[in-house]
């Protein structure tokens, strides 16, 4: 199986989520199940069934995070050579040539992608279109919503 790229910061966030699920959420759900059981007949006990469903969802999320972390290739961006080129983990400031606006993105793996917060996956059209480009390059990227034209203003490895 191929390794999934993730930044060092992304690994820390996923480990924190996993810890919370295992040591906060899981015990709370177990308590809720025990409390619901104490109410008697389980066939008609909505609290019990809701808690059991939540338990299943939580266990699935725990398994998903454990699998993701086991298959992650952690990349510390600060250790990469500073070439001025866009690489995995780099933070890029772009100037949109069409709208005259600047925007910043960080190129990350699928596990930590959060476009609303400027974290875009290396596997997206924008991510793929920027990799290997340098400061000053103008790039034209086809996206599902149309063509985007950018100039790369800054590339940081932070």
Stretches with model-predicted labels:
Residues 22-25, 69-73, 134:
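Conserved NTP-handling cores and scaffolds of large molecular machines
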Residues 1-63, 158:
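Helix-rich terminal scaffold detector
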Residues 75-151, 156:
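Non-DNA-binding regulatory cores of transcription-related proteins
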Residues 1, 16, 37, 43, ...:
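Residue-level signal for pocket-adjacent positions within structured domains
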Residues 59-73:
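Amphipathic alpha-helical coiled-coil segments
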């Amino acid at each position: 199986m191929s390794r999934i790229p993730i930044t060092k910061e992304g690994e820390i966030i996923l480990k924190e989520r996993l810890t919370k699920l295992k040591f906060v959420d899981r015990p709370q759900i177990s308590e809720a199940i025990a409390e619901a059981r104490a109410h008697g007949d389980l066939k008609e006990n909505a609290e019990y069934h809701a808690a059991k469903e939540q338990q299943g969802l939580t266990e699935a999320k725990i398994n998903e995070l454990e699998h993701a972390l086991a298959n992650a290739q952690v990349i510390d961006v600060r250790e990469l050579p500073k070439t001025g080129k866009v690489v995995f983990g780099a933070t890029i400031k772009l100037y949109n040539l069409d709208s005259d606006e600047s925007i910043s993105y960080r190129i990350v793996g699928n596990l930590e992608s959060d476009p609303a917060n400027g974290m875009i996956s290396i596997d997206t059209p924008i991510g793929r279109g920027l990799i290997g480009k340098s400061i000053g390059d103008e790039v034209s990227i086809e996206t599902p919503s149309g063509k985007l034209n950018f100039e790369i203003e800054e590339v940081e490895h932070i």
